[in-house]
Swiss-Prot record:
Gene behind this protein: Slc17a1
Transmembrane segments: 79-99, 117-137, 176-196, 199-219, 260-280, 304-324, 337-356, 363-383, 399-419, 429-449
Source species taxonomy: Eukaryota, Metazoa, Chordata, Craniata, Vertebrata
Keywords from the UniProt entry: Cell membrane, Glycoprotein, Ion transport, Membrane, Sodium, Sodium transport, Symport, Transmembrane, Transmembrane helix, Transport
Domain of life: Eukaryota
Assigned protein family: Belongs to the major facilitator superfamily. Sodium/anion cotransporter family.
Localization (cell): Apical cell membrane
Name of the protein in question: Sodium-dependent phosphate transport protein 1
Length: 465
């Protein structure tokens, strides 16, 4: 709305909307820690020197007694276990996209976070039973985590002023990289000192505590918040007046299918999650096979990309909103800029990793940069749907996430198959495929992305003569 309608003084960082971003930040840390911890503990859980067993039964080796049980799972089984979380995430996207605009997000996100944490607590005993039960736990965890990661975007339709979207969403989404940083940093030490099962117990308990906090601290609509100042309420409501004035109408499916700006977002979501899932899932494996380090050193090295990614994500949020508030660039230019940085920079550093990494240090540097620069996309295509169709944002995020999850599922599973069949040239094939997908989708985005609300996303007003 017009600037004169907005309050002159509103709380900045010390406000409830930023408090909500921090709360979601910690929730995202929890679900990512629960998802990623298996990537590193798998190194300690599996006997790579023993004969593989393709059955669903876990063969326990007498190693370190109960503290560190070891199983003989083949690379195919390991790849299926690691990627099974994406099966659950894929299944839940469409229902969450529909329900997020109907049911309170307090219940949806709070209960889903609790379910994910419960599955983390149950995973060590499930491993004792067999690989099949581990896969079941991971699928259920994927359903819960997909609900949290997709449903939370609907929150910002009512809570994020347009000129603060970059900062609020980047602060929230940066939890997705801080989670892996924390879990990879400490999991190696936990495995050595307490055994790998304690990794799942610790992060499961943390998630349970956060889910209870969510029920007490979150309110679906800022106008219903009992402790928020009237100035902050007026600021949020006034800034969102244009897009929040009308309720959700029937979905313009045909118009959506014909929308090239929407397809640009969808394809780049596919490329982003393909790359992100691949690097998150297989960075510990790459470090173990290429650099030949122990579990503790593996965890430390695997955590470095996420620390830098966290910094890049926060920096991207500040920069994008700075460009918009100072009117240096238009919305579409900002989205294209950060999408390009988040898609093309990882490709450059992956190629450097394959052809210019001559020693231990150069390998670590290029791998760290390839992982971390993905987070520039937080202020690019990942929030572009909020620009072009705020009224359907929850549904569109579910659709883009659904198609993106297929990318994550395919990349994780395919990488496991390639590593099993062609160990010598596997990483070249895996990374070249990732680079090709990133560049192709980026070109499409650069040609067709938009920053203004599309005609099919505007309220239709009928006039009678």
């Amino acid at each position: 709305m017009e600037n004169q309608c907005l309050p002159k003084k509103v709380p900045g960082f010390c406000s409830f909307r930023y408090g909500l971003a921090i709360l979601l930040h910690f929730c995202n840390i929890a679900i990512m820690a629960q998802r990623v911890c298996l990537n590193l503990t798998m190194v300690a859980m599996v006997n790579n020197t023993g004969s593989p067993h393709l059955s669903n039964e876990s063969v326990v080796e007498m190693l370190d007694n109960v503290k560190n049980p070891v199983y003989s799972w083949s690379p195919d089984i390991q790849g299926l276990i690691l990627s099974s979380v994406f099966f659950g995430m894929v299944v839940v996207q469409a229902p969450v996209g529909y329900l997020s605009g109907i049911y309170p997000m307090k219940r949806i996100i709070g209960s889903s976070l609790f379910l994910s944490s419960l599955m983390s607590l149950l995973l060590p005993p499930a491993a004792q039973v067999g690989a099949a039960l581990v896969i079941v736990c991971r699928v259920l965890q994927g359903i819960a985590q997909g609900t949290v990661s997709t449903g939370q975007h609907e929150i910002w339709v009512k809570w994020a002023p347009p000129l603060e979207r970059g900062r609020l969403t980047s602060m929230t989404l940066s939890g997705f990289v801080m989670g892996p940083f924390i879990v990879l940093l400490v999991s190696g030490f936990i495995c050595d000192l307490l055994g790998w099962p304690m990794v799942f117990y610790i992060f499961g308990i943390v998630g349970c505590v956060l889910s209870l906090s969510w029920f007490f601290l979150f309110f679906d609509d800022p106008k219903d918040h009992p402790y928020m100042s009237s100035s902050e309420k007026d600021y949020i409501i006034s800034s969102l007046m244009q897009q929040a004035s009308s309720g959700r109408q029937s979905l313009p499916i045909k118009a959506m299918l014909k929308s090239l700006p929407l397809w640009a977002i969808i394809l780049n979501s596919f490329a982003f999650i393909w790359s992100n899932s691949l690097l998150v899932t297989y960075t510990p494996t790459f470090i173990s096979t290429v650099l030949h380090v122990n579990v503790r050193e593996n965890g430390l090295l695997s955590s470095l990309p996420y620390l830098l990614a966290y910094i890049c994500g926060i920096l991207a949020g500040q920069m994008s909103d700075f460009f918009l508030t100072r009117k240096i660039f238009s919305i579409v230019t900002v989205r294209k800029l950060f999408t390009t940085l988040g898609s093309f920079c990882p490709v450059i550093f992956i190629m450097c990793l394959l052809y210019l990494s001559y020693n231990f240090y150069s390998t670590v540097i290029f791998l760290t940069l390839a992982n971390s620069t993905l987070s520039f996309s937080y202020c690019g295509q990942l929030i572009n749907a909020l620009d072009i169709a705020p009224r359907y944002y929850g549904f569109l995020k579910a659709v883009t996430a659904l198609i993106g999850m297929f990318g994550g599922l395919i990349s994780s599973t395919l990488a496991g198959l390639i590593l099993n069949q062609d160990p010598e040239y596997a990483w070249h094939k895996i990374f070249f495929l990732m680079a090709g997908i990133n560049v192709t989708c980026l070109v499409f985005y650069f040609l067709f992305a938009k920053g203004e609300i599309q005609d099919w996303a505007k309220e239709i007003k009928t006039t009678r003569l």
